[in-house]
């Protein structure tokens, strides 16, 4: 039975091996494998000494095993490749991706066709030949190449978007329309054609730009009509200042054109920047123009230093540009509500122009960023901007000079610093006129925070103002009080100056007692007898009570002191103080009463008292009964109960005597404890 079972098992194994072996159209390999398996089985069963596998059979079996492994690898790689294709979505809008697909189209199609043919062979015959596997392995690089190109395209797209964002940040918010026109001309001359995306974007931004320009023009026209109808004198002064500004603007424009030409010669322009500049100018036009007169100075200052169009700055330069624009925005918003129109302050316009010019030059090419020698006027302006205290002093010193330019500049400064704690009486006539004019135009003064005022004024000025304020309208001794008070401390010093004969305690004695006693003495007496006379000595507001001897209700202070005040907090704090001062009883047992022992035996004394009362009640029942009058019914019941009581036996009497003796002993013990306590 055993050889038959072995033969059956070996036959089943042979069939399984034959079915798992690769079948290639029932060719020679299958036959060789089956023969080898049968030979091995027969040799193993018949002859134990003969080697079971011949070298030829061994080679055939090795080949079949390699083919099976190769097919499994091919299947795994096919599935991986299909998953990768699903994960990498194709972007139909990208031109580069389309071209890369056209280049790699033929090998991809061939590989797909061959994989399909290979799959058909596998389904029909149950396996693959070695040649199919080799073809598939040769096709693998083309598929990997396609996926790599797709990834490269996506990374390039991301880099392009980030570059556009950086360029959008770098360009200043207030670039003028003329810069965009120059850039268009330059792009047409150089022959660079923007792509379709930038064309669409530039068309949309141009439409929005025209709409915003129309709105801004309408708004400026309304403001012009209002200002012209209300004030004619301001127009005349504006014309004079414009005449002075025109030559300056022309020189600034010439400088800006030279700078832009140098930048254009140095670097080439990039695609798609036209649309971004249009959008940047559109954002600035959407901003509401609160002051029509101010817009002229902004315009001229931006025209004076335009950036060259074709520049791609580094990330460091972009960060510096962001910081500069934020500073400009903060400065503009701070001075928004209390500056004069640029027509009336030419010096302020020049100052802002030079400041912005310095900010913008830091963003240009290396030639523009080279340090240029500054004139003495620009250095003085920077010093004034950084040190407003010295500016105020200089304006006060120059007040005697009578030139028109200095008057207008001082007037602008006076109005700018109005509401910031200025000294009374300076430029009062000018301020009233300008206030009326600004209120008519709808401008309101903005109050400055105390931190800004403290920064602007030096310490000496603050002290002088305080002294003037304290001595103002006061004569004789009162003026001396305030001066002495400045030398002394706050509230206490005032009272010491006012009442020099009084005696003051450094700290209330009762408070000291409370704190020290509660902390260091666990047996601190909680009943504190407060003396209001001592406590009120330190309070100057109650001085009149000491003189009169009575308070408002007519009760004297001595009557108030007759009642103690109970300290409830002491009992809550006591356990904590016991834990802290655990060795206090050993150190000072002679002074402190032993309250703990007394408390322990209070219960024993109470029990003794109750027993005593019980004993007395047994001896004199009629005396210790309740005092309520008993009714006739209750009296009859009591008489019946007494009649029912039987006479006590000798044993019961002995028990009662023993109980009485125990009661007496307990009473003696309680008396001893109470005497000790």
UniProtKB/Swiss-Prot annotation:
Cystine connections: 36-57
Glycosites: 93, 115, 237
Pfam families noted in UniProt: Granin (PF01271)
Primary localization class, coarse: secreted
GO CC entries: extracellular region; secretory granule
Location of Phosphoserine modifications: 93, 99-100, 129, 147, 190, 220, 256, 260, 300-301, 318, 342, 365, 375, 378, 493, 532, 543, 626
Segment forming the signal sequence: 1-20
Composition bias type Acidic residues, residue spans: 251-280
Coiled-coil blocks: none
Ranges annotated as biased composition (Basic and acidic residues): 64-90, 118-133, 148-192, 200-249, 306-322, 363-409, 421-455, 491-504, 635-646
Sequence segments annotated as region (Disordered): 63-505, 531-558, 622-646
Compartment list: Secreted
Modified residues (Sulfotyrosine): 348, 472, 566, 624
InterPro entries: Chromogranin_AB, Chromogranin_CS, Granin
Entry keyword set: Cleavage on pair of basic residues, Disulfide bond, Glycoprotein, Phosphoprotein, Proteoglycan, Secreted, Signal, Sulfation
Protein family according to the UniProt entry: Belongs to the chromogranin/secretogranin protein family.
Primary role: Secretogranin-1 is a neuroendocrine secretory granule protein, which may be the precursor for other biologically active peptides.
Record text on subunit structure and interactions: Interacts with ITPR1 in the secretory granules.
Record's protein name: Secretogranin-1
Organism: Mus musculus (Mouse)
């Amino acid at each position: 039975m055993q050889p038959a079972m072995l033969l059956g098992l070996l036959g089943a194994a042979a069939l399984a091996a034959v079915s798992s072996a690769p079948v290639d159209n029932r060719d020679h390999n299958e036959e060789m494998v089956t023969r080898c398996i049968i030979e091995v089985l027969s040799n193993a069963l018949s002859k134990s000494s003969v080697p079971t596998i011949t070298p030829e059979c061994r080679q055939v079996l090795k080949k079949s095993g390699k083919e099976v492994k190769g097919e499994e690898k091919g299947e795994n790689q096919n599935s991986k490749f299909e998953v990768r294709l699903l994960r990498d979505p194709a972007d139909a809008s990208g031109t580069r991706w389309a071209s890369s697909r056209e280049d790699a189209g033929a090998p991809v199609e061939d590989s797909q066709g061959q994989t399909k043919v290979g799959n058909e062979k596998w389904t029909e015959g149950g396996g693959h030949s070695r040649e199919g596997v080799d073809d598939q392995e040769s096709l693998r690089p083309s598929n990997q190449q396609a996926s790599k190109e797709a990834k490269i395209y996506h990374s390039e797209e991301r880099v392009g978007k980030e570059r556009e964002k950086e360029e959008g940040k770098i360009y200043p918010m207030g670039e003028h329309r003329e810069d965009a026109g120059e850039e268009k001309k330059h792009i047409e001359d150089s022959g660079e054609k923007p792509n379709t995306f930038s064309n669409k974007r530039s068309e949309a931004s141009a439409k929005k730009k025209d709409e915003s320009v129309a709105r801004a023009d309408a708004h400026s026209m309304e403001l012009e009509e209002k200002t012209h109808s209300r004030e004619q004198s301001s127009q005349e002064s504006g014309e004079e200042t414009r005449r002075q500004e025109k030559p300056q603007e022309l020189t600034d424009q010439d400088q800006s054109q030279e700078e832009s030409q140098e930048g254009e010669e140095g670097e080439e322009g990039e695609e798609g920047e036209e649309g971004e500049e249009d959008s940047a100018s559109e954002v600035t036009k959407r901003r509401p123009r609160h002051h029509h007169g101010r817009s002229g100075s902004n315009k001229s200052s931006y025209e004076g230093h335009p950036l060259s169009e074709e520049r791609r700055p580094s990330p460091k330069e972009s960060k510096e540009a962001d910081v500069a624009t934020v500073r400009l925005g903060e400065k503009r918003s701070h001075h928004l509500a209390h500056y004069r129109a640029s027509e009336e302050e030419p010096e302020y316009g020049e100052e802002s122009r030079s400041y912005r010019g310095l900010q913008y030059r830091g963003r240009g090419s290396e030639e523009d960023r080279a340090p240029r020698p500054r004139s003495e006027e620009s250095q003085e302006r920077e010093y004034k901007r950084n040190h407003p205290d010295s500016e105020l002093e200089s304006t006060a010193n120059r007040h005697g000079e009578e030139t028109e330019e200095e008057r207008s500049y001082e007037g602008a400064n006076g109005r700018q610093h109005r509401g910031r704690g200025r000294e009374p009486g300076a430029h009062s006539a000018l301020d009233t006129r300008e206030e009326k004019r600004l209120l008519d135009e709808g401008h309101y003064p903005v109050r400055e925070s105390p931190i800004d005022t403290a920064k602007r004024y030096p310490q000496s000025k603050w002290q002088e103002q305080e002294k003037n304020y304290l001595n103002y309208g006061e004569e004789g001794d009162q003026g001396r009080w305030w001066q002495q008070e400045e030398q002394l401390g706050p509230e206490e010093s005032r009272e010491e100056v006012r009442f020099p004969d009084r005696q003051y305690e450094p700290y209330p004695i009762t408070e000291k007692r409370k704190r020290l006693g509660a902390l260091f003495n666990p047996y601190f007496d909680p009943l504190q007898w407060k003396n209001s006379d001592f406590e009120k000595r330190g309070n100057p507001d109650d001085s009149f009570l000491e003189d009169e001897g009575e308070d408002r209700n007519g009760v004297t202070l001595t009557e108030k002191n007759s009642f103690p005040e109970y300290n409830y907090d002491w009992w809550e704090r006591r356990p904590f103080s016991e834990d802290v001062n655990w060795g206090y009883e050993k150190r000072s047992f002679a002074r402190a009463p032993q309250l703990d022992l007394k408390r322990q035996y209070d219960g024993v004394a109470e029990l003794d008292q109750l027993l005593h009362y019980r004993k007395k009640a047994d001896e004199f029942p009629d005396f210790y009964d309740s005092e309520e009058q008993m009714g006739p019914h209750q009296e009859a019941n009591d008489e019946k109960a007494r009649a029912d009581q039987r006479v006590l036996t000798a044993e019961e009497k002995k028990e009662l005597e023993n109980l009485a003796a125990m009661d007496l002993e307990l009473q003696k013990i309680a008396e001893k404890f109470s005497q000790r306590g």
